[in-house]
Design a protein with these regions (language model features):
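Extended catalytic core of nucleotide-activated donor transferases of GT-like folds
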Residues: 47-116, 126
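Donor nucleotide-sugar binding/catalytic pocket of nucleotide-sugar-dependent glycosyltransferases
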Residues: 117-132, 136-152
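Conserved catalytic-core segment of nucleotide-activated headgroup transferases in glycan assembly
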Residues: 149, 157-224, 231-232
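Short alpha-helical segment that forms part of, or immediately flanks, the ligand-binding pocket
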Residues: 176, 242, 265-270, 284-285, ...
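Acidic donor-binding loop of glycosyltransferase active sites
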Residues: 245-260, 273
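Short glycine-rich donor-binding/catalytic loop of glycosyltransferases
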Residues: 256, 273, 277-284, 298-299
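Conserved acidic donor-binding segment of nucleotide-sugar-dependent glycosyltransferases
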Residues: 289-300, 308-313
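A charged, aromatic-enriched C-terminal amphipathic alpha-helix characteristic of glycosyltransferases
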Residues: 314-343
Length: 344
């Protein structure tokens, strides 16, 4: 059994947070990895901005304001540059990043990385290409996220859902573009179709607060399009999200160069929801083009693929079954094993 310490100084959350409401991707990843490592027999402590000390599913959640230990077998610093130098006598230090690594060029990151030389862990092949080759480090590892077990065991649907598309990502990542396309091309071709949006700043904590006005403008526009089948609602906790995805026929998401994993599409695909996107950022890693969804090269082909999946039952079923077969294999236990290999 190894002693594993994880530190995060972002938003306030703990192991019970996914059960209480929607949670950002990086935060959900910390919870899932910590629990998977405990499941593999390790002692895991998470030091973060949780409201109070808590043990949940075997993971010790401890307010970081009280300090961190000096030693561990594996220390995982999550995102923040101030965390890199903590737990100084850890046998192996890891810097786990989730956003494109361009920001690591900032002097405060370069200095902290130069002093500690941790292994930088990226969450996908595209993500790894954003790490500058000259960046000080003790190694570079690619460890994709796993999928929560709730997403990995869906059965094939007996009949297709109604012509309902769903969007569950950051509204600043292409939702305006999608609303344009919905109004100009998709809805006119299929007036009975609906676009259900579950998005908002609450998922992103303080970062969402800083972007709340910009998000609100896009979401207000979505609400104004109710007459053409657009339904705008709040982000959903996990159980309700799974239900909404299973009742949707296709996930529509343009993609973004800042998308390093895209849990929204990964979860939809694992549940058998075909997806239409463009080949931006990590989206080619999430969709098997022409098999579990479509990677559209332009707006016209995006609209055509969307309409086809909303309308054509045979096309939908083929991609639905392929997604169930091919897109739900990687678990958080798999990801935990990859982190285990970093322990000296």
């Amino acid at each position: 059994m190894a002693r594993i310490v994880i530190a995060d100084d972002g938003v306030s959350f703990d192991g019970s947070s996914p059960e209480a409401g929607p949670l950002g991707g990086a935060e959900a990843a910390v919870v899932a990895l910590a629990e998977a490592l405990v499941g593999r027999g390790h002692s895991v402590e998470v030091y973060n901005r949780c409201a109070a000390r808590l043990t949940h599913k075997g993971v010790a959640w401890i307010p970081i304001s009280g300090g961190t230990p000096s030693s561990a077998d594996l220390y995982i610093a999550n995102r923040g540059h101030r965390l890199i130098g903590l737990v100084p006598r850890a046998r192996r230090a890891v810097f786990w990043i989730h956003n494109p690594a361009w920001y690591l060029k900032k002097p405060r990151y370069v200095w902290a990385l130069w002093r500690r030389r941790p292994v930088i862990v990226c969450i996908g092949a595209y993500h790894a290409t954003t790490v500058p080759g000259w960046m000080p480090r003790g190694g570079l590892a690619v460890i994709p996220y796993g999928l929560a077990e709730e997403f990995r065991h869906a059965e094939p649907l007996a009949s297709p859902p109604p012509p309902r598309a769903i969007f569950t990502s950051n509204p600043q990542r292409g939702l305006d573009w999608l609303l344009d396309l919905w109004g100009i091309s998709i809805h006119p071709a299929l007036p009975e179709a609906e676009l259900h949006i579950h998005a908002g700043p609450a998922v992103y904590g303080e970062a969402g607060g800083r972007q709340a006005a910009a998000m609100a403008a896009v979401l207000e526009r979505a609400r104004s399009m109710e007459s053409i089948g657009v339904c705008c609602a709040q982000p959903l906790p996990r159980a309700a999200l799974i239900k909404a995805l299973r009742e949707s026929r296709v996930m529509l998401y343009r993609g973004d160069e800042n998308e390093t994993f895209c849990a929204a599409v990964a979860e939809a695909q694992a549940l058998g929801v075909p997806a239409v996107a463009q080949p931006l950022g990590s989206l080619p890693e999430r969709i098997v083009d022409g098999v579990t969804g479509e990677l559209a090269v332009d707006a016209a082909s995006f609209a055509a693929s969307s309409v086809a999946l909303l309308r054509d039952d045979e096309r939908w079923r083929r991609m639905h079954l392929a997604a169930l077969e091919r897109q739900r294999g990687r678990s958080w236990d798999d990801a935990a094993q990859s982190f285990e290999r970093l322990i000296p």
